[in-house]
Amino acid sequence: MSAAAGPKVAFFASPAFALPVLEALRAEFEVVLVVAQPDKPVGRGLKLTPPPVAARAAELGLPLAQPHKLRGNADFAAQLRDSGADVAVTCAYGKILPAGVLEIPRFGFLNTHTSLLPRYRGAAPIQWALIRGETVTGTTIMQTDEGMDTGPVLLQEELPIRPEWTSVELSAALSEQAAALIVRALRTLETLTPQPQDEAQATHAPLLVKEDGFVRWADPAQAVLDRFRGVAAWPQTTAFFGGKRLKLAGLTLGQGKGQPGKVLQVGAGGLTVACGEGAVCIATVQPEAKKAQPAQVWAQGQNVEQGARFDLWEPPQG
């Protein structure tokens, strides 16, 4: 299909995750407008930096808008209307779309969501699918309404989750899947039948907070490992030992059992720590304000031996 033969597309997105989707769209259709979040201060120098999608759009010479707000923004509404977009596609854009904007394109807005809706509605579906131990996830193409991922479903495709994947690898796989699926949806846009979501099956995937990365040693070892996989990109896995905060990496299932948080073994293969059921092996430890180091080196430097115990942390109740 030539770009001229398909619908004209406005693309609303910001992070690097959405770049394969942008490339797929511009290869198949005419992208008449890219809409991204405003530039933000980054790094120690707080240099204003465009989000990855905005930077790529500028490189490609695509029309670009970065409005600070959408609701009540007559100038932006006019820009979207004047672009001639037949349909708009959103992919991790990061802003709720008001009704006045949703109504502008002739075919409305389509959202690429990285879960099998209605499961894992919200900002962090990839991370929570891993934390909850899912073995299959996928991508949904849905019509956007004013709710949070509540619109009718147009297309879905499953993706098996490999046991070694963290949120980094799963994000990359879903990004490519989303790129292919949105092209398929746009090619057949006028023949797709929207299917309402089953509200009774809805689950939620809220934005992660730092505490989501804290190890719950009382959990089964598999749950500790699944949490590690889910928070690998951010906030990463954090544990406490003697009141001091540590970042943990290279977690795998270990051998043995004991009191949650108890060190079962210190060796060249890492640090084996008991969980509520089973144990995990930790390859790398990073103390606060220090470089990451092999767990055995850290243990020797801190005189951590078999029988020592990590601090227990539990999420506050209520």
Curated annotation (Swiss-Prot):
It holds the Pfam family Formyl_trans_C. It catalyses: L-methionyl-tRNA(fMet) + (6R)-10-formyltetrahydrofolate = N-formyl-L-methionyl-tRNA(fMet) + (6S)-5,6,7,8-tetrahydrofolate + H(+). GO terms for molecular function: methionyl-tRNA formyltransferase activity. The keyword Glycosyltransferase does not apply. GO terms for cellular component: cytosol. InterPro entries: Fmt (IPR005794), Formyl_trans_C (IPR005793), Formyl_transf_N (IPR002376), Formyl_transf_N_sf (IPR036477), Formyl_transferase-like_C_sf (IPR011034), GART_AS (IPR001555), Met-tRNA-FMT_C (IPR044135), Met-tRNA-FMT_N (IPR041711). (6S)-5,6,7,8-tetrahydrofolate binds at residues 115-118. It is an enzyme of class 2 (transferase). The keyword Plastid does not apply. Keywords: Protein biosynthesis, Transferase. One of its GO terms (biological process) is conversion of methionyl-tRNA to N-formyl-methionyl-tRNA. Its EC number is 2.1.2.9. Attaches a formyl group to the free amino group of methionyl-tRNA(fMet). The formyl group appears to play a dual role in the initiator identity of N-formylmethionyl-tRNA by promoting its recognition by IF2 and preventing the misappropriation of this tRNA by the elongation apparatus. Belongs to the Fmt family. This is Methionyl-tRNA formyltransferase. The gene is fmt.
